[in-house]
Amino acid sequence: MNAVLMWMRRTWMLGIVFIIIQCLTWSRYQEAYRDWSWTISLVQGATMLGSPFIAGVCAYMVHRQWPRTTRRDLAGTGRSHHLVSDMTWAVITWGWAAQAVFLVIGCVSCVVHHADSSGLTLPWQLLTGPIALGASAWLGTLAACLWDSVMTIPVMVLAVFLAHQMFWDMHLPQLLSPDFATVPMLSLIHISEPTRRYA
């Protein structure tokens, strides 16, 4: 645990980047506070950008901090399995922290505006974002450990991004993008706008 905290102190800038990624998704949907399902989907949907980023970061950090020669030299120290796991968990924790911050903000907004909760599908909606970030981080770490080349970084970023697009095209609800979950709400908002205009 101390090692994870040490890595978190060394990688504090990642927390800011993950917050920015959440902001980029949040700013596209100004009416999110009207619906609980939509709000939670936005928090989880930021993995469209966050997962490729975290995969690339983990691959980069493995190559920079623990190249294959270093891992081989330290293999007999008894902590070889912690060489990359502590670092990976630190990166994942920053991603989860950013998600938690925006989840709290979204929940407070929904409570204040008496948002509709009929579309909630718990716990599915709350789990997909953290799982997607964690899986992408470990994929980046594993790929960097198996393929000792700097090309691992752009390859992992592109591969994870394309995988997100593929899952989105399969229309798996709430998995990796907010778009599928918000289709019903979008239609309601478009219908309600003329009504408000003539009211």
Question: What residue spans do the PLM features occupy?
Answer:
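Aromatic- and glycine-rich beta-strand/loop motifs that create alpha-glucan
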Residues: 1-14
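Hydrophobic alpha-helical elements at and bordering transmembrane segments
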Residues: 4, 83-84, 143
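Secretory targeting signals
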Residues: 21-53, 58, 88-157
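Helix-loop-helix units of permease transmembrane domains in multi-pass membrane transporters
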Residues: 57-94
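Transmembrane helix segments
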Residues: 151-178
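Membrane-interfacial helical/loop segments at transmembrane boundaries in membrane proteins
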Residues: 174-188
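Single conserved hydrophobic/aromatic residue that forms the stacking wall/gate
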Residues: 189-199
